[in-house]
A protein has these predicted regions:
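A structural signal for conserved, well-ordered secondary-structure elements
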Residues: 1-400
Length: 400
């Protein structure tokens, strides 16, 4: 009994993908340049607290509140222009609020606190304050002190205190105390509760990232993507031929930029999760491209003598059904996350969906045509070199 299989794309399909390669490449270059302009010049990426530094709060309201109202209220607190965006769906009444400050305590205020406590408590031997860490003061005393007294002295200097922690120390050693002062999150939460009611606003989560740490994370994110592409370049070069590698890398750069464009257009936060999305898209895209390259290699051996252009087009058509089914199945699972997910999960799924579509497109219209161009370019170069007149000494040697 003959088995019949479902075929999404009928065998023998001969759609000419290579015919439109110039239009596709020109269109891709234009879109990529627009995305890069948008990411770096205007309107620029909406960096999350991971990269921009500052304080980010997730705030839940038990009644309907507009983002503009929250923004206006936070703006009154003197943190500069805050970023306020809805988190999840509208019914959840949750917002992400980001300000550039990570601490209310400045170096000047810390010096003032140190001077006041030094005067009131001569047993103090030192105080440490790091603006990158945030609202924390570390004190050292020759002998144990009353924590309540330390709290009142710090507050008397104009710095509200959340907590005083005594660190354990051995007898005869200096005693250390850590004073945790109120930060931007406390001030914002207090202002919103004063505006909407004591139980109306709840700070669900607060994240702090210093500006130097944010820059380092941004650099590390870029390096992670570059390292991944470099390893893929080496892998493709060894598995196939180094003529295939440039096409893969250009396609991956294209996919990474298109995924970046999702964050530029939607104004969703670009953070460490976004870098994870780009790395995932790069991995998914190269898998799709390698499947087509495998078929190109097989067909090149099977159809020796045929132009590479025809072999590439044949290979894409033969793998068309597999590509559509694989990408479609992944896209369906992402649609479920988009519909049911919220916040970061939803952003991840949306960006992945864009990346998968871009990866499928780049396999057909970027990576494969680039391989053809490199082959044609090398053939032209060989023909030009062969047509050049040989030096007389080489002609004489050939005559012998």
């Amino acid at each position: 009994m003959e088995m019949k299989y479902f075929e999404l794309v009928k065998s023998g399909t001969t759609h000419d993908f290579i015919k439109y390669r110039r239009v596709a490449i020109i269109g891709s270059v234009i879109v990529n340049l627009l995305v890069l302009f948008g990411a770096t010049v205007w309107p620029r990426l909406n960096y999350g607290v991971d990269f921009a530094g500052g304080t980010e709060l997730q705030i839940h309201f038990n009644k309907t509140v507009e983002a503009g109202e929250v923004r206006d209220e936070v703006s009154k607190l003197g943190f500069g222009e805050p970023t306020v965006q809805r988190y999840g769906n509208e019914a959840e009444n949750q917002f992400l609020v980001r300000v550039e400050r990570i601490a209310l305590l400045t170096q000047e205020k810390a010096d003032l606190v140190k001077a006041d406590i030094q005067q009131a408590m001569p047993t103090m031997t030192g105080m440490r304050f790091d603006p990158e860490v945030g609202d924390k003061l570390d004190f050292t005393f020759k002998q144990p002190i009353d924590e309540g007294t330390l709290r009142s002295l710090v507050e008397k200097a104009g710095t509200p205190v959340k907590e005083v922690r005594a660190l354990s120390g051995r007898e005869g050693q200096d005693r250390e105390y850590t004073v945790i002062t109120q930060g931007p999150g406390d001030k914002i939460g207090g202002a919103l509760r004063a505006k909407y009611g004591p139980d109306a606003a709840e700070v669900v989560r607060t994240d702090y990232v210093g500006p130097q740490v944010g820059k380092q994370l941004r650099t590390d994110g870029i390096l992670a993507v570059l390292y991944a592409m470099g390893m893929i370049l080496i892998y493709v070069g060894f598995r196939f031929d180094f003529r295939f590698s440039p096409g893969v890398i250009i396609a991956l750069i294209h996919d990474a930029i298109i995924t970046l464009g999702f964050f530029v257009v939607t104004r969703h936060e670009f953070n460490l999760t976004s870098v994870t999305v780009i790395l995932t898209v790069v991995g998914y895209s190269v898998n799709d491209t390698i499947v087509v390259y495998d078929r190109i290699r097989e067909n090149a051996q099977r159809h020796k003598g045929r132009p590479l252009r025809e072999i590439v087009n044949l290979s894409i058509n033969e793998m068309l059904g597999r590509t559509i089914l694989t990408s479609g199945a992944t896209a369906l699972s992402l649609v479920g996350l988009i519909v049911m997910g919220v916040g970061t999960i939803q952003d991840f799924a949306l960006a992945m969906l864009v990346g998968i579509i871009s990866g499928t497109y780049s396999t057909w219209y970027i990576a494969s045509p680039m391989t053809i161009w490199l082959e044609e370019h090398s053939e032209q170069k060989r023909a030009i070199d062969a047509a050049k007149p040989k030096p007389k000494n080489q002609q004489a040697a050939a005559a012998r």
